[in-house]
Amino acid sequence: FGIGPGDSRFVDMVDAYDPMLRRKLLDSAKAAGVVCHEGVYIFFSGPSFETPAEIRAARVLGADAVGMSTAPETILARHAGLKVAALSLMTNYAAGLVPGALAHEQTLSVAATAADKVRLVLRTFLERCA
C-alpha cells in the first residue's frame, strides 16, 4: 500500500456492496423471519454519539441510518478486492429524535436482545453462500 506510481489507495465505491450478495443477505433474512430494510447508511467516526446538528445534516444528505462502523470496513474490504455485503443493527434513535441523553448501555441492551436474530440471519446467509 505504498505511495507512488500505480498507487491504488483511492478505491471505486460506486458499487461498494455486491448486488448478488445483498440479494442473498436480504433473502436470508426473509427466510429467517427477520425484517430487514435497505437504505442509505452514513458514517460518522466515534466513539461518540452524533450531535443533533449532524443528524439533521445526515437527513439532508439522504441518510436513512447513521453509524460509527461499516463504512471503513467496507472501504478496506473493497481495497483488498473483496465482494461486500453489510448488515447493520440499529441500536438507538439518533440524537435529537427522542428526548433525553443517549447512552451506550442502551445500545448494548438492544444488541443483546437482537443477537439471536442476527446470528440466525448470518447462519442462513452463510449456508446459502456455501
Walk through the language-model features, giving the residues of each.
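Glycine-rich phosphate- or other oxyanion-binding loops that anchor nucleotides, phosphorylated ligands
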Residues: 1-93, 98, 105-130
